[in-house]
Swiss-Prot record:
GO MF terms held by the record: potassium ion transmembrane transporter activity; symporter activity
InterPro entries, alphabetized: K+_transporter, K_trans_C, K_trans_N, Kup
GO cellular component, one term: plasma membrane
Catalytic activity: K(+)(in) + H(+)(in) = K(+)(out) + H(+)(out)
Similarity comment text for this entry: Belongs to the HAK/KUP transporter (TC 2.A.72) family.
Name the UniProt record assigns to this protein: Probable potassium transport system protein Kup
Length: 676
């Protein structure tokens, strides 16, 4: 309750932070929305008053319905301990029905796909404003698209390279910069409106509906694909509620909406006053309506806004992946914390994939106009899936009623219309967005359902009580019939409730070739919410050589298990919890600790598994993903330790070994090797 009250609170500082973090994507939409509409209708010299008024009406009512109503008014109510976003929403309702995992997986994959497209299209659109701009007398340094691409790629390379340092310092400038940006949008819009208040007819939704069926609209319903670009970024208002608070989003949105609306009004008036321009499709009304003496400053400001929008998407992608890992949608990855706040994270693997994909998209599409064809489709998918999950949440809270039914029908219809119009651009680049979404969704499906199949079909008991095997381990430790495998045999094992351990761990010690050791260590690493926690707890089960260690490490601490364990051993020997391990041959006089061997146990599917081909493939693919996702030596800080990775059979399904029939040996008593 205290968390909810804090998030509902609105403060001046909170409003500024919200403007800097939440609205980057939707705030850069004026850079390309009207340009895309004009290009789709044949160029500026072919448009008329009905088209412009209808277009602006469509933009305003799309933003009103999808951003203001669906997101700000409805979605912000569905928070999970103050956190928002599609995965937080899914976590609230996942027990309601098993099928809800599908819209969550697909929607999450679509948002991650958008994380590659947003930096590409926003930065390219901003830099394209430099093309043809004179610096001094007749000096045009950016005269072609190749130069635009070079500048764009350099900016993106710098942006992705600095992610490891976090955004704590530069993030403080986001709010003031975006505040200036939105004020600039509003002022430029007002200046270009002048006395042409007839443009306010666009506030009437009649003109929006009329345009869809008007002969002046050469694009037909496909125009919605361009219109939808005005609301991309609406999902950020929901996903970032945990960072900035519900009250600050609700309080700052009216200012942002007014500034955006004024700019679209201004662009509309400027277009109708300049329909005699010779350029058919290349003109960008956003830059064209800005006075030449401040155009360079506007490009710098637009570039900063584009970078902030991209930064917000990158940071959001890190958060989304971390949530996916917690929900077992994605395999474990190396997560770093550049600051002392756990909310600020950096995932090297995700950063690398985002950077490579984004730059590849820039090189592939080359212009922002081509990128716009791919942009938007993935977001229509995420909005539709969020609508489905929101409906289930409303039913969970309020039960089945007419209002909830009308909500899902109305907003699903709108989202499907936008998705259909975006699909009309499929062959022009939309397929790229869909391919990225499908690729990410495929990884999630394999990991989630592979885990599910494995957990449902593990033969026998997956976990056993460690305390039931302590006598056997103690006897093996003193059994001279077996050579000593190591003084200290350490298994990185997730011991649950301080006593339950995976059967495969004990299988590795006892069933393969019995591994004799002076001491058996079972280490569990627990990451805490505090940044610098460094604690451990010990349970020896009443023995001197079977030790369960629970490590509690802060999220900023390195997982250096090798270093921590040596200190723990010395502590336990000192207080006589375990026996000393004096060494006869050593370069360190008085050394009383022996050698360590660390064991990581990986699963391989046993040939005895009786699952269907599809389920067997799922589990195999899941194992491959686990092997590719993170090097266990790096994760546990064992790069310089004596470590082995063992494979143990994973037996799934019913055990029905094939019986082979015994027959009498063939009688060769009369056979001869001599040929006659």
């Amino acid at each position: 309750m205290e968390v909810e009250n804090k998030l509902n609170r609105m403060t001046a500082a909170g409003l500024l932070i919200a403007i800097g973090i939440v609205y980057g994507d939707i705030g850069t939409s004026p850079l390309y929305v009207m340009k895309s509409v004009i290009a789709g209708n044949g160029g500026i010299n072919t448009v008329g008053r009905d088209l412009i008024i209808g277009t602006i009406s469509l933009i305003l009512w799309t933003v009103t319905l999808l951003t203001t109503v669906q997101t700000v008014i409805i979605a912000l109510r569905a928070t999970n301990h103050g956190e928002g976003g599609i995965f937080a929403l899914y976590a609230l309702i996942r027990k309601k029905a098993a099928w809800l995992v599908w819209p969550a997986l697909i929607g999450g994959a679509a948002i991650l796909a958008d994380g590659t497209l947003t930096p590409a299209v926003t930065v390219t659109s901003a830099i394209e404003g430099l093309k043809g701009l004179e610096f001094g007398k007749g000096n045009v340094p950016v005269s072609n698209q190749t130069t635009v691409l070079v500048i764009t790629i350099v900016i993106l390379l710098v942006l992705f390279s600095i992610q490891r340092m976090g955004t704590r310092i530069i993030g403080k400038a986001f709010g003031p910069i975006m505040l200036v940006w939105f004020a600039f949008l509003g002022v430029m819009g007002l200046i270009n409106i002048g006395g042409n208040w007839w443009i306010l007819q666009a506030l009437n939704p009649y003109y929006a509906i009329k345009l869809l069926f008007s002969p002046y609209n050469k694009a037909g319903f496909a125009i919605l694909g361009s219109i939808f670009l005005a609301t991309t970024g609406a999902e950020a208002l929901y996903s970032d509620v945990g960072h900035v608070g519900k009250g600050n989003i609700i309080g700052s949105w009216p200012f942002v909406f007014v500034c955006l609306s004024l700019n679209y009004f201004g662009q509309g008036v400027w277009i109708l006053n300049n329909t005699n321009m010779h350029s058919a499709t290349e003109i960008n009304p956003f830059y064209a309506m800005i006075p030449e003496n401040i155009r360079l400053a506007s490009i710098v400001l637009a570039t900063l806004a584009a970078i902030i929008a991209s930064q917000a998407l990158i940071t959001g992608s890190f958060t989304l992946v971390a949530e996916s890992i917690n929900l077992k949608f994605l395999p474990r990855m190396n997560i770093l914390y550049p600051s002392d706040e756990r909310g600020q994270i950096y995932i090297p693997a995700v950063n690398k994939m985002l950077g490579i994909t984004t730059i590849a998209l820039v090189l592939f599409f080359r212009t922002s106009a081509h990128m716009e064809a791919a942009y938007g489709l993935s977001i229509t998918i995420s909005m539709l899936t969020t609508t489905i999950l929101l409906y289930e949440w409303l039913v969970l809270k309020q039960g089945h009623n007419l209002a909830n039914l009308l909500f899902v029908i109305f907003f699903s219809t709108i989202n499907i219309l936008f998705m259909g119009s975006s699909l009309s651009k499929f062959t022009h680049g939309g397929y790229v967005s869909l391919l990225i979404t499908l690729l990410i969704a495929s990884v999630m499906v394999v990991w989630y359902f592979g885990n599910k199949v494995r957990d449902q079909n593990v033969a026998g008991n997956a976990y056993v009580r460690l305390d039931e095997y302590t006598d056997m381990l103690t006897n093996l430790s003193h059994d001279d019939n077996y050579p000593t495998y190591s003084d200290n045999l350490v298994y990185m094992a997730n011991v649950k409730y301080n006593k339950f351990i995976k059967r495969e761990i004990l299988y590795s010690i006892l069933d393969k070739r019995p591994k004799r050791a002076r001491a058996y260590w079972f280490v569990t690493v627990n990451v805490t919410n505090e940044p610098f926690t460094a604690e451990y707890a010990v349970n020896t089960f009443g023995t001197k050589n079977v030790i369960n260690i629970q490590l509690y490490l802060g999220f900023k601490k390195q997982t250096s298990v090798n270093v921590y364990l040596r200190q723990i051993v010395h502590d336990l020997i000192k207080d006589n919890t375990i026996e000393a391990q004096p060494q006869e041959y050593t370069t360190t006089p008085g050394r009383d600790v022996g050698d360590f061997k660390f064991v990581i146990v990986n699963d391989v599917i046993s040939p005895s598994t009786t699952l269907s081909s599809y389920k067997k493939w799922l589990v195999k693919a899941r194992v491959q993903l686990q092997n590719l996702s993170l090097n266990p030596a790096q994760w546990f800080g064992l790069e310089f330790a004596d470590m082995v990775i063992e494979r143990v059979p994973l037996i799934l399904g019913k055990q029905e070994p094939e019986r082979i029939k015994r027959v009498a040996p063939v009688d060769y008593s009369k056979a001869s090797l001599n040929k006659k």
